[in-house]
């Protein structure tokens, strides 16, 4: 089976086409107190149905190093204070921010939260300092069928595609 990975980017916050959630019970909050277990647990819970496998073999030490890294910021999405999803932003030394992981728990998919969650991720990426030159993400054909459309709807532009056999 061929898996296509698509890379998208945005070079200005003005490119963002926002989508808000009208339901006030849906909220997004940064995890100010770092907890690598939160990152690990959400990686498994969100990524299970999308075949996120590369980090399943990580040890607790690897998760701790990743989750506590100063360049990483993690945000949780909540609906009526129930955890609904998350995203991770990782800044590099060149002034680029990657939306490293992004997704909703299965029971919250299809409820109109994805666009609002991605809007928040992109807005928060542009707020990171010092100045940010680019926000980028990659998705693949194993991800949610609407993932690529959501990224493009928010104003992200494809800059590369790669195909690989699984």
Regions flagged by a language model, labelled:
Residues 1-32:
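Acyl-donor-binding surface of acyltransferase catalytic domains
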Residues 3-8, 136-138, 157-166:
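Conserved catalytic-core motifs of GNAT/GCN5-like acyltransferases
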Residues 20-55:
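Short amphipathic alpha-helix that is part of the acyltransferase structural core
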Residues 64-76:
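A short helix-loop-beta-strand connector motif used in the catalytic cores of GNAT acetyltransferases and
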Residues 76, 82-91, 98-103:
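Conserved beta-strand in the GNAT
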Residues 91-100, 109, 131-133:
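A conserved beta-turn-beta hairpin within the catalytic core of GNAT-like acetyltransferases
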Residues 101-104, 110-127, 148-153:
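Conserved acetyl-CoA-binding loop-helix of GNAT-fold acetyltransferases
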Residues 109, 135-147, 164-166:
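Conserved beta-strand-loop-alpha-helix junction that forms the acyl-donor binding cleft
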């Amino acid at each position: 089976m061929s898996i296509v990975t698509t890379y998208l980017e945005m070079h200005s916050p003005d490119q963002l086409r926002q989508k808000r959630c009208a339901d006030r019970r849906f909220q997004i909050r940064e995890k100010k107190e770092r907890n690598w277990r939160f990152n690990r647990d959400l990686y498994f819970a969100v990524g299970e149905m999308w075949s996120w496998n590369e980090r399943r073999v990580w040890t607790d030490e690897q998760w701790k190093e990743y989750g506590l890294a100063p360049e990483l910021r993690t945000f949780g999405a909540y609906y009526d204070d129930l955890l609904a999803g998350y995203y991770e932003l990782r800044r590099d030394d060149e002034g680029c921010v990657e939306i490293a992981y992004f997704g909703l728990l299965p029971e919250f998919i299809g409820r109109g939260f994805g666009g609002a969650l991605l809007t928040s991720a992109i807005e928060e990426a542009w707020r990171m300092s010092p100045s940010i030159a680019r926000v980028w993400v990659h998705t693949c054909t194993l991800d949610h069928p609407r993932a690529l459309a959501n990224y493009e709807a928010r104003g992200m532009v494809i800059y590369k595609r790669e195909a690989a056999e699984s």
